[in-house]
């Protein structure tokens, strides 16, 4: 009757026009329905405008909906719709909006608003629906206007019963019956409508009751009833908008109001309802239109009906969980807006009475009962899938698509068996599929490859896969899997051939059925599958079959196995190609204890380090009785084995975890403990020699097959580590692995028992494991290196993420930072980082070093040997020197062959000490390393960066939470930890810290970054880790780190100039110099803290200057660096300062103080003496930061300059890790040095010394101020100045000596 004001009123005769807008439903409905006659014009008006408006303005006026709701108040249809829309909208919207809408409804009862609302409603529905599927489908209907739907709607809505009969029905429950009539018809599609109706009624009862007179209520009731019927009748035929519009056209008022308002209000209600809301809106509109006619002059009769309907609606809504419904009436009023929110009126009040959303049908039938809560959703779903099923229960289209989030609360029917996607659920393989029986992918019904190919499944009745006779479908799946496996096998064969060409004889691949795809033991799966499984695991799920085994490895086996552990799988795969990488991964994997502490169950990285893993893995399994890799857990392996083909994924998760062999090494012990059943550590280690045998035995036992080349291929595929351990394992394992000591000695230096290479933070057991693993890896490395040469590249590519940190170093200079950061995060999140750090330092580092040491292979090996015992022990206790040298060597080797000699030199000094334990293995490894060196230089680069990086990282990230209290461990991961603390506290520091994580810096500038980073990471972290103890270790490690750092710097310098020269040149070029502004931030905040810290930095600087000039020779240089490294400033400055200063002096001081070899001391004084003068000195100014602008630069410069340098040491390093890539390795040191010269002597002193402590404090301050976390240079400077006082205050409470690293 009242055409929406905004609605262009088409002539009443414009029935046809409405059809045009919503041709589907509109065309016939208007003429058809009695209501259509009067309503048609309005409906048409609304229809035409509504479709446009709705589509056009759906989103336009989110609040218009509210207005519309008000409108709806005027016209019951309108309020209804608005409420619905609101409800729907408010589904997403908040109660506030509901209130808004109510107010607006009350304020505005214009049809235009209704139209807008409906438009918005639709839009919101779209928004909502897209997200919530409910609304979305409605929208599509709206936009599409399916003729049938609309036609149906029209007819239904137009059905005479609507206005007259329903008026009465609604009051009494009879309405449900009429409604049911329609409902049954509509219910499918209109179930939601009914909900909406109910909501609307409920809302209307309250809102509209208030707003609308009884008359309105009667009309509204009629409209609602009709609407319901129409909805039900059209059963989705509503054609969304058209329907509401078209056959809703029947009420004149419905037309204008129902349409405009109905649309608006109803739309709103519908909006509240959900996807069906569009339909509901339309239906509502139409109903409203129907009511529209009577709406204006709603009689008491109508009112009663309406109120009854409202009550029912409310009940249904409430019962339905008006929450879902969102208060359909409410929507318009805003009351209905919330699903459950409604004033409680529509849904809450009434809905509660009714059953629940499940009652949608009934509610629909019942009048509006159903229309209430559930229905809105039902409709939402229905709309899309409203087409058919039954009155209120249309099959939920979203459920069919697997996207229905309503679950049991969905108003649409989920009673349909969805055909499973003919694909194995990769999560099921792992034993963890959250969707359980609801998973669209195949679980236990997937054919067991092992059983169907060999006729025998080791898992027997416990197999995760189906042993039922093959059907056409399952046979097709099996054939496809086997074909994939065969393809993978072909790839494996190629890989094996390539390896053989390289002089690497991979172990024979296990027979197809062997254990390539052991069924993963579900939860244990991740751990259970080990090398043996690791391979199978690596192999795709399908690899289990004979042909598949090879393919799985290359194609997916590694990946699937590693799905959880991509790095691992990469490594494993790479291991297959590059065992060293796998070994690295293995080493990287934290020890079982570590993993446990970290909660990282990442055998993955461990797994990837298959070589070792396989050894241990195989070894224990051998003892265990090959069939079950001990690592895999007997049950695990067997399970995995059989199903592995299908469970490849399970294996993959398990693979990583499963590759206990590898994990066993580093993290494997825990894994191993499973498999070997021996102590995780020692048990695992001893098995390592057996591992290869075990592999053979395992495969033989498993499949009763001998270790065939296929096995090796699989092993390679699955775990290159296996291959590594296999051959290298046989030779190396027996030699060193056989000896516990040799394991510790020869084993990965970092990981071996000696734990010398192992981070001190590691528990003794873990350390022993780490050492053993390292040794084993070393032993395996000869072979592994060969494999690694080829496989390392692959692994690096595959390893990307986890291996990325080191592979990036080699391959990607700049992007490596990103990858490193990414990998660091990954590692941090999943034990791999810790293990990587550890491994890199010890185990990983060893294989890599050996591999990467090629240039300084023996040095690297000795270092590695040293790393596990001497270097690691010394390094952990004294010396990142060995670790640094190791990392630096690999890095140097990797980053710069030129630098490698230096690295070797440094390494050899370190190597001798470190190589004590590894002496013998190094010899073997040297050969292997040499072989690998040429090809594996890349690997060394990866390992080396990983080495120190990993060590610190593992410690930092993995053990950061575990060993944060441990100074030593903190330092190692202090950098990583610093990252977090620094992120939390000083971002600038984190930048520097990032530098320490050489990965980023290294990758951007592998050589310099690795050196500085490693030196800082390995040495400084150690120094940091043990501020006190670090002095000793730093002394040892300091010299070594000096060499390493120097060598790294020199490498960079080789590019830039001499060590010292690079420092100076580095500074200017280094972004740090550019970033100097960061320091100002530090400087400013540091001003207050700088004063206090300045004193400390001063002393630290004094040593640092000394170290700086001496650079290589002066551990004292560490003092300034130590403050940096320690970030404690005072704490490590004294004792740790010496060590740190070596590293810092080397990386930071050389670059910084190369200008004044002896200026370091002078700058130290300057730093203490001239905070302002220290401007040049990033650090000095950082501490005193009197001149934030320049100092910041200096500080940043230094942080970047001295990646390992004071600033760069930890916080700045971290910062630099991001920025460092810009400076690049050489640039950073050069920048450091260069900046000081420009700045003058004072800057240098300040730079190296104060900035670290100061930076730590300052940066912390600044970051807190929010200066600019990583980049203190920019906003930090300003913020530093602005927040200098607050930062000072903040940091006054902070112990400058308490570095974030050591927190």
From Swiss-Prot:
Annotated positions of the Asymmetric dimethylarginine modification: 601
Family annotation (InterPro entries): Su(sable)-like, Znf-CCCH_4, Znf-CCCH_ZC3H4/6/8, Znf_CCCH, Znf_CCCH_sf
GO molecular function: promoter-specific chromatin binding; RNA binding; zinc ion binding
Ranges annotated as C3H1-type zinc finger: 390-417, 419-446, 447-470
Biased composition (Basic and acidic residues): 80-99, 219-235, 305-321, 377-388, 630-650, 717-739, 782-795, 860-875, 1067-1084
Compositional bias (Pro residues): 1-33, 507-529, 539-558, 605-624, 659-673, 1235-1245
Gly residues bias spans: 252-274, 1129-1139
Record field: compositional bias (Acidic residues): 53-73, 135-144, 194-218, 278-304, 358-369, 486-496
GO aspect biological process, one term: DNA-templated transcription termination
Biased composition, class Low complexity, residue ranges: 904-918, 1097-1110, 1224-1234
Residue numbers bearing the Phosphoserine modification: 76, 92, 94, 807-808, 904, 907-908, 1104, 1108, 1110, 1114, 1269, 1275
Role played: RNA-binding protein that suppresses transcription of long non-coding RNAs (lncRNAs). LncRNAs are defined as transcripts more than 200 nucleotides that are not translated into protein. Together with WDR82, part of a transcription termination checkpoint that promotes transcription termination of lncRNAs and their subsequent degradation by the exosome. The transcription termination checkpoint is activated by the inefficiently spliced first exon of lncRNAs.
Similarity comment text for this entry: Belongs to the suppressor of sable family.
PANTHER family in alphabetical order: ZINC FINGER CCCH DOMAIN-CONTAINING PROTEI, ZINC FINGER CCCH DOMAIN-CONTAINING PROTEIN 4
Subunit relationships: Interacts with WDR82.
Protein name: Zinc finger CCCH domain-containing protein 4
Organism field: Homo sapiens (Human)
């Amino acid at each position: 009757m009242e055409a929406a004001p905004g609605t262009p009123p088409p002539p009443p005769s414009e029935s046809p026009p409405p059809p045009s807008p919503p041709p589907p439903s509109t065309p016939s409905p208007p003429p058809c329905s009695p209501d259509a006659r009067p309503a048609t014009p309005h409906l048409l008006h609304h229809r035409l405008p509504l479709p446009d408006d709705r589509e056009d303005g759906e989103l336009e006026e989110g609040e218009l909906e509210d207005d519309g709701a008000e409108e709806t108040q005027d016209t019951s249809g309108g309020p209804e719709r608005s409420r619905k829309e609101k409800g729907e909208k408010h589904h997403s919207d908040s109660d506030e909006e509901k209130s808004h809408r109510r107010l607006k409804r009350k304020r505005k009862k214009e049809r235009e608003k209704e139209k807008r609302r409906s438009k918005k409603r639709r839009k919101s529905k779209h928004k909502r629906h897209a997200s919530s599927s409910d609304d979305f489908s409605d929208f599509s209907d709206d936009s599409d206007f399916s003729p049938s739907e609309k036609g149906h709607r029209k007819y239904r809505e137009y059905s005479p019963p609507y206005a007259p009969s329903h008026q009465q029905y609604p009051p009494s429950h009879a309405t449900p019956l009429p409604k049911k009539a329609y409902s049954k018809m509509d219910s499918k599609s209109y179930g939601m409508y009914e909900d909406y109706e109910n909501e609307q009624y409920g809302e209307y009862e309250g809102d509209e009751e208030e707003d609308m007179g009884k008359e309105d209520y009667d009309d509204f009731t009629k409209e609602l009833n009709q609407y319901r019927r129409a909805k039900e009748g059209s059963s989705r035929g509503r054609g969304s908008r058209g329907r509401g519009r078209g056959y809703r056209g029947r009420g004149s008022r419905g037309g204008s109001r129902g349409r405009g308002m109905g649309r608006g209000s109803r739309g709103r209600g519908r909006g509240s309802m959900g996807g069906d809301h569009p339909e509901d809106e339309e239906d509502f509109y139409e109903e409203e239109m129907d009511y529209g006619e009577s709406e204006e002059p709603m009689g008491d009769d109508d009112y009663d009906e309406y109120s009854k309907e409202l009550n029912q609606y409310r009940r249904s809504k409430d019962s339905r969980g008006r929450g879902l419904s969102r208060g359909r009436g409410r929507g318009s009023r805003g009351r209905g807006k919330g699903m459950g929110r409604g004033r409680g009126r529509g849904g809450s009040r009434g809905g509660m009475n009714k059953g629940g959303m499940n009652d949608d049908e009934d509610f629909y039938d019942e009048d509006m009962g159903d229309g209430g809560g559930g229905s809105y959703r039902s409709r939402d779903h229905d709309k899309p899938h409203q087409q058919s099923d039954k009155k209120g229960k249309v099959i939920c289209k979203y459920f069919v698509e697997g996207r229905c989030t309503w679950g049991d609360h969905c108003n649409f029917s989920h009673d349909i068996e969805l055909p499973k996607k003919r694909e194995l659920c990769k999560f099921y393989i792992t034993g963890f599929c959250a969707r359980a029986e609801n998973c669209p992918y195949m679980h236990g019904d997937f054919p067991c490859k092992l059983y169907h190919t060999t006729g025998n499944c080791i898992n027997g009745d416990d197999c995760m896969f189906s042993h039922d006779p093959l059907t056409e479908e399952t046979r097709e799946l099996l054939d496809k899997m086997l074909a994939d496996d065969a393809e993978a096998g072909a790839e494996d064969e190629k890989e094996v051939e390539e390896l053989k060409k390289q002089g690497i004889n991979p172990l024979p691949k296990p027979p197809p059925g062997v254990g390539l795809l052991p069924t993963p033991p579900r939860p244990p799966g991740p751990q259970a599958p080990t090398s043996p499984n690791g391979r199978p695991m690596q192999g795709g799920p399908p690899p289990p079959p004979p042909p598949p085994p090879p393919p799985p490895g290359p194609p997916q086996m590694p990946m699937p196995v590693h799905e959880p552990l991509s790095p691992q799988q990469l490594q494993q795969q790479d291991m297959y190609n590059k065992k060293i990488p796998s070994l690295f991964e293995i080493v990287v994997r934290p020890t079982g204890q570590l993993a446990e502490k970290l909660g990282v169950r990442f055998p993955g990285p461990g797994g990837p380090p298959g070589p070792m893993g396989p050894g241990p893995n195989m070894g224990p399994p051998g003892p265990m009785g090959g069939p079950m890799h001990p690592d895999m857990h007997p049950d695990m392996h067997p399970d995995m084995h059989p199903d592995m083909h299908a469970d490849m994924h399970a294996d993959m998760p398990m693979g990583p975890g499963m590759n206990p062999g590898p994990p066993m090494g580093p993290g494997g012990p825990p894994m191993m403990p499973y498999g070997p059943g021996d102590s995780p550590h020692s048990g695992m280690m001893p098995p390592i020699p057996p591992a290869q045998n075990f592999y053979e035995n395992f495969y033989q036992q498993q499949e009763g097959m001998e270790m065939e080349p296929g096995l090796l291929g699989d092993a390679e595929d699955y775990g290159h580590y296996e291959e590594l351990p296999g051959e290298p394992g046989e030779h190396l394992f027996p030699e060193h692995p056989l000896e516990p000591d040799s394991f510790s000695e020869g084993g990965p230096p970092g990981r071996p028992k000696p734990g010398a290479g192992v981070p001190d933070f590691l528990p003794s057991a873990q350390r022993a494991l780490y050492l053993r693993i390292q040794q084993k890896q070393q032993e395996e490395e000869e072979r592994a290196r060969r494999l690694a040469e080829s496989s390392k590249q692959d692994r690096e590519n595959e390893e990307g993420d986890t291996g990325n940190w080191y592979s990036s170093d080699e391959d990607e200079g700049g992007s490596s930072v990103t990858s490193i950061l990414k990998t660091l995060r990954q590692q941090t999140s999943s034990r791999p980082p810790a293990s990587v750090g550890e491994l890199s330092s010890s185990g990983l580092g060893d294989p890599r070093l050996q591999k990467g040491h090629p240039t300084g292979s023996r040095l690297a090996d000795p270092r590695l040997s040293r790393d596990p015992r001497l270097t690691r022990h010394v390094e952990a206790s004294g010396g990142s020197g060995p670790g640094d040298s190791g990392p630096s060597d690999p890095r140097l080797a990797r980053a710069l062959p030129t630098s490698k000699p230096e690295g070797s030199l440094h390494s050899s000094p370190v190597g001798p000490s470190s190589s004590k334990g590894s002496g013998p293995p190094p010899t073997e490894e040297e050969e292997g390393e040499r072989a690998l060196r040429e090809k594996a230089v890349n690997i060394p680069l990866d390992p080396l960066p990983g080495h120190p990086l990993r060590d610190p990282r593992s410690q930092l990230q993995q053990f950061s939470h575990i060993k944060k209290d441990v100074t030593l461990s903190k330092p190692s991961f202090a950098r990583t930890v610093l990252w977090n603390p620094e992120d939390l506290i000083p971002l600038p520091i984190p930048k520097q810290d990032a530098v320490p994580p050489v990965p980023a810096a290294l990758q951007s500038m592998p050589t310099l970054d690795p050196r500085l980073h490693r030196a800082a990471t390995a040495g400084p972290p150690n120094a940091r880790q043990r501020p006190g103890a670090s002095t000793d270790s730093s002394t040892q490690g300091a010299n070594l780190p000096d060499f390493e750092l120097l060598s790294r710097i020199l490498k960079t310098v080789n590019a830039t100039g001499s060590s010292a020269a690079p420092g100076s040149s580095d500074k200017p070029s280094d972004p740090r110099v550019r970033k100097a502004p960061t320091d100002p931030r530090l400087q400013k905040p540091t001003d207050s803290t700088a004063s206090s810290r300045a004193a400390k930095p001063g002393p630290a600087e004094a040593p640092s200057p000394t170290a700086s000039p001496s650079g290589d020779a002066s551990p004292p240089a560490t003092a300034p660096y130590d403050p940096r490294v320690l970030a404690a400033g005072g704490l490590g400055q004294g004792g740790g300062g010496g060590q740190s200063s070596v590293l810092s002096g080397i990386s930071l001081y050389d670059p910084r103080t190369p200008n004044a070899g002896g200026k370091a001391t002078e700058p130290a004084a300057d730093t203490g003496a001239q905070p302002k003068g220290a401007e040049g000195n990033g650090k000095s100014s950082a501490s005193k930061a009197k001149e934030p602008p320049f100092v910041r630069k200096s500080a940043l410069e230094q942080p970047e300059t001295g990646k390992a340098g004071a600033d760069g040491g930890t916080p700045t390093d971290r910062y630099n890790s991001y920025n460092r890539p810009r400076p690049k390795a050489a640039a950073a040191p050069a920048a450091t040095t260069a900046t000081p010269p420009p700045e003058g002597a004072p800057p240098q002193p300040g730079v190296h010394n104060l900035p670290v402590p100061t930076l730590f404090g300052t940066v912390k301050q600044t970051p807190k101020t929010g200066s600019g976390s990583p980049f203190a240079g920019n906003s930090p400077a300003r913020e530093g100045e602005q927040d200098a006082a607050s930062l000072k205050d903040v940091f006054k409470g902070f112990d400058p000596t308490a570095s974030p690293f050591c927190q």
